[in-house]
Amino acid sequence: MNPRRKKRLTLAVALIGGVAAIASLLLYALNSNLNLFYTPSEIVNGKTDTGVKPEAGQRIRVGGMVTVGSMVRDPNSLHVQFAVHDSLGGEILVTYDDLLPDLFREGQGIVAQGVLGEDGKLAATEVLAKHDENYMPPEVAEAMGQKHEKLDYSQQKSATQ
């Protein structure tokens, strides 16, 4: 192999190696910032289609309804703990160390983003409350709508009369 061809080959291999290293670092950075959405049932039982459960230490988003009577506030700090449930019966505890949104209340739909702990609790870094009676995050609406059955009040009322 002549020196010119050897130099080109070395340059090509170095260029391909550099591109591969940059792509690897980029994918690693994207993977660590990836937030997957789960319902409480999916955290407890795994995703319905794949059975995959989130791992401890993973950043996730959880959506559902705040369980009535589950909120516990620390009187000496901003620390609050509450449970979030969904229509499938799954429930997860969420801890949060900041001011809750003004519209946050028990029985309200929320989305919490944070890190799943070894104990199964979500250490939330952000809590979003729904802002009016018609709004629900698309992921929560889809998950809750799978088991939601619409009632026809006109038929129900005529049956009782």
UniProtKB/Swiss-Prot annotation:
It comes from the Bacteria. GO terms for cellular component: plasma membrane. The keyword Heme applies. One of its GO terms (biological process) is cytochrome complex assembly. Residues 138-161 are annotated as: Disordered. GO terms for molecular function: heme binding; metal ion binding. The chain crosses the membrane at residues 9-29. Its main location: membrane. InterPro entries: CcmE, CcmE-like_sf, NA-bd_OB-fold. Pfam families: CcmE. Residues 30-161 are periplasmic. Keywords: Cell inner membrane, Cell membrane, Cytochrome c-type biogenesis, Heme, Iron, Membrane, Metal-binding, Signal-anchor, Transmembrane, Transmembrane helix. It is found in: Cell inner membrane. It is a single-pass type II membrane protein. Residues 1-8 are cytoplasmic. SUPFAM superfamilies: Heme chaperone CcmE (SSF82093). Gene3D superfamilies: Nucleic acid-binding proteins (2.40.50.140). Heme binds at H131, Y135. Heme chaperone required for the biogenesis of c-type cytochromes. Transiently binds heme delivered by CcmC and transfers the heme to apo-cytochromes in a process facilitated by CcmF and CcmH. NCBIfam families: PRK13165.1 (NF009638), PRK13254.1-3 (NF009729). Belongs to the CcmE/CycJ family. HAMAP family: CcmE. This is Cytochrome c-type biogenesis protein CcmE.
